[in-house]
């Protein structure tokens, strides 16, 4: 339906949005039917341009700092009005969507976009409900105006673009940005603030279920394997990135997937490969002269993406929900080549490694990254998205693990035999074999060896995995150099963890520097 006065298209279909995007020059059609769009210079998130309005209702509960930058309420009001005025005579696309598959914990949101492909992205990634807002909750508003240019002197922003969350007014403003991932991560941040007050743990994780209804969670930063490992032909997908864990079950916060495409292959990632078809948005993917996507081409960015609805996946959990998880996997991408491919964690170790969030930034998911791969400690495996203090989420995780009896594992999808540039990265089949052993229950009560410096218990055998890979010192030619690197990593853990106020049991669960 279109409004003839200022051309507003309400709840447009996928076909309509693809048509609009092509007619308006926003993108091109690929040979596999997907829509390719380019985001320009900002091909990843812009954390330096993300703000939260500092206002009385939420001020005391937010951990203010470089991640959650404060924005003045009056400045927000002025900027919101300027963006609305800018869009007043533009053709717009509007949908009423929801965030959160749980009937109690959803948030209704009206998404208004200047670009057709941004609206298609929103309809792919958020939930299109059969009946909008059945509990009549107050509705959130997202406005996305990529062609609006912010003026820092006038608007109070840090640059010509911004992302601002306003919890009191239930508004999200995106201006000057074409990278569509900002939309989904904004509403993830909203749920990350709201859910803990309802006793629900919001998680930066993927989730799937087996034929017997057993749920597995995969925590990790972008590029560490959440989407790839949860898209398992033998299991049913709940979701690939954002979930809530409530007493009694797990639910997807989204209605779609946002998969990294760099080096995508049909052999290694058949579920994702098959999901890329008409209706999918490909971000910054390069095509050849026949419009065939070249997933190896990183000339625009390493952070190439595919955004598709869950309906594009044959083996999925149709209600986007699952039982509480028997297995919880923390995915770490270790660039030092020190960590084992799999470790079995106690609940105290789970809390330690959840708070630490040791991993790597893979494939420049943020603009301004100095290199494609660098080690980092990202609290809760998603520090950029969690507005409350880290302890709030860690306490909820401990509570859920203890209550249900979930077993937590640390899985390294990074390097072995040496650091990045010297060693080699664990291949996907090896990691899949480890995950298969985890979800089958094979690793419960198995014989382990203890790595003293890392303070980790490692199984001595895993079906389908070369046993020499399990203890990382075996893969290094220079054993003394491995010991040196392991000590350095333990020291980095200890230094990073010093900022947390936790029990001795949790502090002592980490590596021994």
UniProtKB/Swiss-Prot annotation:
Report whether Kinase shows up as a keyword of the record: no
Matching entries from PROSITE patterns are given as: PEPCK_ATP
The residues that the entry says bind Mn(2+) are 185, 204, 241
Annotated residues that bind substrate are located at: 45, 179, 185, 305
The record's subcellular location field reads: Cytoplasm
Catalysed reactions, as listed in the record = oxaloacetate + ATP = phosphoenolpyruvate + ADP + CO2
In its keyword annotation, does this UniProt entry include Metal-binding? yes
Identify the Pfam families for this entry.
PEPCK_ATP
Give UniProt keywords alphabetically: ATP-binding, Cytoplasm, Decarboxylase, Gluconeogenesis, Lyase, Manganese, Metal-binding, Nucleotide-binding
Single GO cellular component term: cytosol
User: In the record's cofactor note, how is the cofactor described as bound?
Assistant: Binds 1 Mn(2+) ion per subunit.
Alphabetized InterPro entries for the sequence: PEP_carboxykinase_ATP (IPR001272), PEP_carboxykinase_C (IPR013035), PEP_carboxykinase_N (IPR008210), PEPCK_ATP_CS (IPR015994)
Q: In which pathway does it act?
A: Carbohydrate biosynthesis; gluconeogenesis
Cofactor (UniProt): Mn(2+)
Q: What biological function has been recorded for the protein in this entry?
A: Involved in the gluconeogenesis. Catalyzes the conversion of oxaloacetate (OAA) to phosphoenolpyruvate (PEP) through direct phosphoryl transfer between the nucleoside triphosphate and OAA.
The record's note on quaternary structure and interaction partners says: Monomer.
Q: Write out the similarity annotation.
A: Belongs to the phosphoenolpyruvate carboxykinase (ATP) family.
Q: What is this protein called?
A: Phosphoenolpyruvate carboxykinase (ATP)
Gene name of this polypeptide: pckA
